[in-house]
Amino acid sequence: MNRLPPTNPARRHFMEIVAAGAGRLSTIAIASSLLAVSRTKDANALGIFPKDDPGTAPHCFGRGTLILTDRGEVPVEDLATGDLVVTANGALPVKWIGLQTMKRNASASWHPSVLPIRVSRFAIDDQTPQRDLYLSQEHCLLIDGVLIPVKYLVNGSSIAFDDDAKMSETIEYFSLELDSHEVVLAEGTAAETFRHWGGQIAWDNLGDYQDLYGSKQEVMSPFAPICRYTGGRAEVSGLLRLAASRFVDVRDPIQIAYDRIAARAVAIAA
């Protein structure tokens, strides 16, 4: 494993994020087990899945996103196979950079699911992101020890759909794949790398990828539990109240993150 200087401030903050989230994982596991005792259709309203299926939407970075490497920050589109990127597990080599380009007719509108989401500078905390971060809607951020799709954090202010992209004729997404599912620093923010889940990949350069690695890919285990709603938020709140304990905080981890980030946006705007 490649190691980086311990004095690197961005990496130090990265490790603080990972360490802070570790203590919350046991709470989430307990909450998940409490909810799992119910076998009704509502019992899975909040999915906390160590082996979650992310669906077929792209999980990617926008063009120009700066990724921390062993030689500093590099735009994601300029990374190449073999480059070392900073992860919680040290500096690991890039396996592939996938490109997905979507185009629209000038007279048509983008489908809402295609539009990127902008995470504004310092939307998460006092240090992250260091600059505006643009992600596909299903792309996960590491918050409180779990991976949360950024679409669940949209508040219309500090985290919002990219209005500029609505007028663009093309939208590009870049996938950063390593040999395993990891979390890297994108604009200083802990964000997931691409994870094979067994579904179909729609990269422009898929043919080149298959020439190197073949068409069959092993499903990757996620770096951390992936949280997503598979039912309504109201259903989740009711289930969590039923599982409430004086000793265990079983609140919805997505709602906790959303509320904290939204409150921060209001405070910054004041």
Where are the predicted features?
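N-terminal secretory signal peptides
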Residues: 1-13
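Short, positively charged, Ser/Thr-rich terminal linear motifs in low-complexity/disordered regions
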Residues: 3, 16-18, 26, 265, ...
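Generic anion/oxyanion-binding catalytic loop in active/binding sites
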Residues: 3, 34, 71
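N-terminal export signals
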Residues: 13-37
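Sequence-level preference for short, compositionally simple segments enriched
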Residues: 46-57, 171-270
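Long beta-strand-rich cores associated with HINT superfamily self-processing modules
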Residues: 59-73, 84-213
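Structural motif
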Residues: 77-83
